[in-house]
Amino acid sequence: MKRNEFLKTSSMLVAGSMFSPLISCTSQAKNVRKNWAGNYQYQAPEYYEPKTVDELLTVMKRAGKRKALGSCHCFNDIADSPLAQISTKNFNKLLSIDEQAMTVTVEAGARYGQFAPELDKKGYALHNLASLPHISVAGACATATHGSGVKNGNLSSAVSGLELVTAKGDVVNLTRANDAQLFNGAVVGLGALGIITKMTLDIQKTYQVRQDLFQDLPLQSLLDHFEEILASGYSVSLFTDWQDKKISQVWVKRKVEADTKSMGPDLFGAKAATKNLHPITKLSAENCTEQMGVPGPWYERLPHFKMGFTPSSGEELQSEYFVPKMHAVEAFQALEKMGSIIYPQLMISEIRTIAADSFWMSPCRNQDSVAFHFTWKQNWEEVSKILPQIEAELAPFNARPHWGKLFKVDPKVLKERYEMLPEFLQLARMYDPQGHFRNKFLDLNIYVR
């Protein structure tokens, strides 16, 4: 499935503006904007593609309701606006590397898979990546997107500084070192505070990674050795369709050290794969990153999918729920009982670990977490009936949904599960007192009474 291409900025000049919004003035097909999965059509009638901060400031002065748009990888309306979307696609550069501070500064719309090779050539790496390298930095961090690893925080945890433009046109810089609480509130900001223009990320010396895959892990082995299995590599993912009392695949990603050895033919009863695999076993692994223990650069092994390929198996929907790691086995057992309900609409589920962080609106705030991800067939009518059942099963564990994916959790329940929500609302009102960045998603899920 190819991504929808955004319309090009009109060359017509509008009085008081450096460029005009893209609005429905030509054929409908050219003006329809959807997310990458194609399940959501954006409703904002105006669309801008500024190339500089000055152009962004010009847009901010004339736009009313507005919202930043990144790489369109969210499955809901979090990035939509009743009036204007402002794309960060032209803010896509690696700006600088500070070798003393061990940080890299990139523009907000930079995609991990695009700047990672450049960073690697300089001898540096990020601590982790998500399963897709196609996502933009600001959007990923604003929604607490993550990879896996019991000691690895989500992508937001690498952020040490950010620059954002507020509704008033003020350029605000916040850093982990100097701004403490404001910073912890702003990093996972859900697009509520302003438009991020650049971010500074922690880096480390570059490293290589190998992937070893195992198939058909017996369910009882997982229950008996859950923590051992998920700690068996730097980053570990479990794939399951909730059928046949087994985990279909175990992906173990390990940093390559001088003493790194083969994991052998067996992992707690799962057998080593004999060829490269797609998470959905029946699909071709052509678009997946290299496996079979072949070492490679961190940015070509930590994601599941190659940058040059469309990762999707076709049109799909996604949901994900985070539970405290201490309750992971109980949560798994609760979901496993729902296998017959989940399976008919499921493509695949993935189970990952994420280390705790301190961001106010992060699902992993103050808790090491296990995330249960669902890739669904694109049948929202049926999936929307299953989600409340999943959420009910996970309710005893105070499960928190991924902000950029699909969920049906009652907003009042979200309010209970995010202790810092009142403080976050104060922060949002401080930077956006007139609510220019509010939209249906925020009104429903965040600005709840």
Question: Across the structure, where does each feature detected by a protein language model lie?
Answer:
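Noncatalytic alpha-helical scaffold of FAD-dependent oxidoreductases
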Residues: 2-449
